[in-house]
Amino acid sequence: MKFLALFFLALAGVAFAHDGGMGGMDMIKSYSILGAMIGLGIAAFGGAIGMGNAAAATITGTARNPGVGGKLLTTMFVAMAMIEAQVIYTLVFAIIAIYSNPFLS
């Protein structure tokens, strides 16, 4: 049941992408929005898993050796920034795919 609700929620972007009267262009725009949503969802999901693993490893390392907690925290922040950068790159790609799609011009 949850998968069905998620499926219909994902297709809501396709329903809102319909402008009417554009011929085949509305299909390209619909698939651009759907692809952007799926890509951004996968990137955010993977980033969240990576951030959770990084935080768990940092907490475990600090619990085992409190003396290196500061160095581990700095390394964790760098890793978090790199993980978040991948999600931001996917967001930029999704925005480009939606608003400046070369197949729509």
Curated annotation (Swiss-Prot):
GO terms for cellular component: plasma membrane; proton-transporting ATP synthase complex; proton-transporting two-sector ATPase complex, proton-transporting domain. The record marks E84 as: Reversibly protonated during proton transport. The lineage of its organism: Bacteria, Pseudomonadati, Campylobacterota, Epsilonproteobacteria, Campylobacterales. Pfam families: ATP-synt_C (PF00137). F(1)F(0) ATP synthase produces ATP from ADP in the presence of a proton or sodium gradient. F-type ATPases consist of two structural domains, F(1) containing the extramembraneous catalytic core and F(0) containing the membrane proton channel, linked together by a central stalk and a peripheral stalk. During catalysis, ATP synthesis in the catalytic domain of F(1) is coupled via a rotary mechanism of the central stalk subunits to proton translocation. Key component of the F(0) channel; it plays a direct role in translocation across the membrane. A homomeric c-ring of between 10-14 subunits forms the central stalk rotor element with the F(1) delta and epsilon subunits. It is found in: Cell inner membrane. SUPFAM superfamilies: F1F0 ATP synthase subunit C. This is ATP synthase subunit c.
